Amino acid sequence: DITEEVLLKNQFYTEQRKLQITLEQSADLYWFFDYDLIVNLLNDAVANALRYCNSRILLKITQLQQKLLIEVHDDGPGFPTFMLNSDALDMNTPDLANNHTGLGIFFAKLIAGAHTNKGERGTVNLTNGGELGGGVFRLTLP
């Protein structure tokens, strides 16, 4: 199961920093996707949240309008403005001074967009606020 693998990959870091990851997942939810690509994408999103959170992360996996919705919420400071304002695949204004190159979101959008079903493509978007007040990474797969 995708969530178990991601949680196990981050268990050591989570325990060392005494961070809490809560999982909310709809029961009996099955979806077709490239397992390895989505595990890597989700692992990167969780690792980023662990890097910037204060103490808590919420991993939510639900079905919404015939789509799979995977969200990673954290209680950190949120995403930088340049990342929130970019709808493009490329990150034209990296913040190298703060180690924000935008490559992670670039690859996440490529991976999401490679997942198609009935003429729709997967998407990734970033917001601030969310259930824990910090950044929210949202992956939607058709």
Which residues make up each language-model segment?
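Conserved micro-motifs of the catalytic ATP-binding
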Residues: 30-33
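Short conserved segments within the C-terminal catalytic ATPase subdomain
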Residues: 13-22
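Conserved polar catalytic motif of the HATPase_c/GHKL fold
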Residues: 43-44, 48
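Glycine-rich phosphate-binding loop
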Residues: 97-110
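Glycine-rich/acidic phosphate-handling loop/turn and adjacent ATP-lid/helix
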Residues: 73-99
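Glycine-rich ATP-binding loops of the HATPase_c
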Residues: 113-129
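Short beta-strand/loop element within the Bergerat-fold HATPase_c
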Residues: 56-66
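A residue-level detector for a conserved hydrophobic packing site
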Residues: 38-39
